[in-house]
């Protein structure tokens, strides 16, 4: 596993609090995509807009969500602001925001803390969790909580990394985890 999103409300709280704290300009850009009346609950507003059937509504929201998430996923992003001109372009609209909005608007089709409450079912199954130390999307606390309940899981923190596989060390750590798991289960 690379980063764990198992407590949807906690992860959204983390994004909602880390975005204005670490990237205040990006947060302003993120809010400015929304009408003034929808800014009090921006995450829910984005879900509604991304899932709206009108491309005039869903494309700018999906682009803003996707780009904001990309910036938050990197430990040292190249850009820290949204490109306002690119938000309305229909070229290359990312699919991920549509899938995420559907799942997250439905609490990932899980009850609150279901992943952690059901961790006992993982007993006897080996696992490795690769976790970027500075992951703002899937905070390390969730991986830590899961590994504490899943005794056969090993958590490997990657220092100086966020969520993305493109951060230094994350891809290598994931590849090593795959090789280590293959070695373990082939015995």
What label would you give each PLM region?
Residues 1-11:
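Active-site nucleophile loop of the alpha/beta-hydrolase fold
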Residues 140-153:
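Active-site-adjacent alpha-helix of alpha/beta-hydrolase-fold enzymes
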Residues 120-124, 149-150:
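Short, conserved loop/helix-junction motifs that constitute active-site signature segments
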Residues 111, 136-142:
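Conserved alpha/beta-hydrolase "acid-adjacent" motif
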Residues 153-187:
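Catalytic active-site module of serine/aspartate enzymes centered on a nucleophile-bearing elbow/loop
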Residues 122-123, 129-131:
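Short beta-strand/loop motif that positions the catalytic acidic residue
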Residues 10-15, 169-170:
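Short aromatic-enriched loop/helix-cap "lid" or pocket-rim segments at secondary-structure transitions
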Residues 18-118, 125:
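Alpha/beta-hydrolase
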């Amino acid at each position: 596993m690379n980063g764990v999103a198992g407590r949807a409300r906690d992860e959204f709280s983390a994004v909602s609090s880390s975005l204005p704290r670490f990237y205040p300009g990006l947060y302003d850009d993120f809010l400015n995509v929304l009408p003034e009346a929808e800014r009090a609950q921006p995450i829910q507003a984005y879900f509604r807009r991304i899932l709206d059937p009108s491309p005039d509504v869903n494309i700018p929201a999906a682009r803003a969500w996707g780009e904001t998430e990309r910036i938050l996923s990197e430990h040292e992003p190249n850009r820290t602001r949204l490109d306002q001109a690119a938000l309305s372009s229909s070229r290359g609209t990312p699919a991920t925001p549509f899938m995420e909005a559907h799942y997250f608007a439905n609490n990932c089709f899980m009850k609150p803390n279901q992943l952690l409450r059901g961790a006992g079912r993982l007993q006897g199954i080996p696992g490795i969790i690769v976790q970027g130390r500075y992951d703002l999307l899937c905070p390390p606390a969730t991986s830590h909580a899961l590994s504490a309940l899943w005794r056969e899981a090993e958590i490997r923190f990657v220092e100086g990394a966020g969520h993305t596989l493109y951060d230094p060390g994350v891809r290598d750590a994931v590849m090593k985890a795959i090789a280590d798991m293959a070695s373990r289960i082939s015995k």
